[in-house]
Swiss-Prot record:
Record's protein name: Inner membrane-spanning protein YciB
InterPro entries named in the record: YciB (IPR006008)
Main location: membrane
Protein's cellular compartments: Cell inner membrane
HAMAP family: YciB
Gene assigned in the entry: yciB
Keywords: Cell inner membrane, Cell membrane, Membrane, Transmembrane, Transmembrane helix
NCBIfam families: ispZ, PRK00259.1-2, PRK00259.1-3, PRK00259.1-4
Annotated Gene Ontology cellular component terms: plasma membrane
Bilayer-crossing regions: 22-42, 50-70, 76-96, 121-141, 149-169
Lineage: Bacteria, Pseudomonadati, Pseudomonadota, Gammaproteobacteria, Enterobacterales
Disulfide bond entries: none
One matching Pfam family: IspA
Topology class, membrane: Multi-pass membrane protein
Organism expressing this protein natively: Klebsiella pneumoniae subsp. pneumoniae (strain ATCC 700721 / MGH 78578)
Function summary: Plays a role in cell envelope biogenesis, maintenance of cell envelope integrity and membrane homeostasis.
Length: 179
C-alpha cells in the first residue's frame, strides 16, 4: 500500500499532463503529494522524512513553475531531489562514518561494513547519474520525452537498481541469514 501511495502523485502528474498541460500536471502533483502526506499522517500517525522533504520541494518548485509559468522549475526539482539524496548518502559515509543505507536497513540486515559502504556509495552514484540524465533530458529534449522519462524511465531505473542492490545484499549476507 505504501509503495502505491508513493507512486500515486507521479501517476496523477502523468495523467494531468496527458489530459491538459505541464502546469495542470504540476498543480495536480502538488495536491496529490499533499493528499498522500496527509493520508500518511492520519492513517499511520507518521510522516517519513523523505516524504516531507519531497513534498516541500514539490511545493516550492511546483509553486515557482505555476507562478512564473515556466516549466524549468519543475524540471529542476528532480535533479535537486537526487542531489540531496546523493549528498545525504555521501555525508553519512564520509562525515558521520556510518552509511545512511546501514542506518536505514542495519536493524534488519547483518552485512560487513565494506558492503554497507559500497552499497551506500553505489546509491549515491546512481542518484548523481539520474540527476545528470534528468538535466540532459529535461533541457535538451522535448517536454513530452522528459515527462515520460520522469514517470517511466526513472521509475524503471530505480526498480532495476533496487533489484540489483537486493542481489548484492543477498550475495554478501552471512549464510545463517539466507534462510
Amino acid at each position: 500500500m505504501k509503495q502505491f501511495l508513493d507512486f500515486l502523485p507521479l501517476v496523477v502528474f502523468f495523467a494531468f499532463y496527458k489530459l491538459y498541460d505541464i502546469y495542470a500536471a504540476t498543480t495536480a502533483l502538488i495536491v496529490a503529494t499533499a493528499v498522500v502526506l496527509i493520508y500518511s499522517w492520519v492513517r499511520y500517525r507518521k510522516v517519513e522524512k523523505m516524504a516531507l522533504i519531497t513534498f516541500v520541494l514539490v511545493a516550492v518548485f511546483g509553486g515557482l513553475t505555476i507562478f512564473f509559468h515556466n516549466d524549468e522549475f519543475i524540471k529542476w526539482k528532480v535533479t535537486v531531489i537526487y542531489a540531496l539524496f546523493a549528498g545525504a548518502l555521501l555525508f553519512s559515509q564520509w562525515v558521520m562514518k556510518k552509511p545512511l543505507i546501514q542506518r536505514m536497513l542495519g536493524k534488519e540486515l547483518s552485512l560487513p561494513q565494506q558492503v554497507w559502504s559500497r552499497l551506500n556509495l553505489a546509491w549515491a552514484v546512481f542518484f548523481i547519474l539520474c540527476g545528470l540524465a534528468n538535466i540532459y533530458i529535461a533541457f535538451w529534449l522535448p517536454q513530452n520525452i522528459w515527462v515520460n522519462f520522469k514517470v517511466f524511465g526513472l521509475t524503471a531505473l530505480t526498480l532495476v537498481f533496487t533489484l540489483l542492490s537486493g542481489i548484492y545484499i543477498y550475495r554478501h549476507m552471512p549464510q545463517d541469514d539466507h534462510h
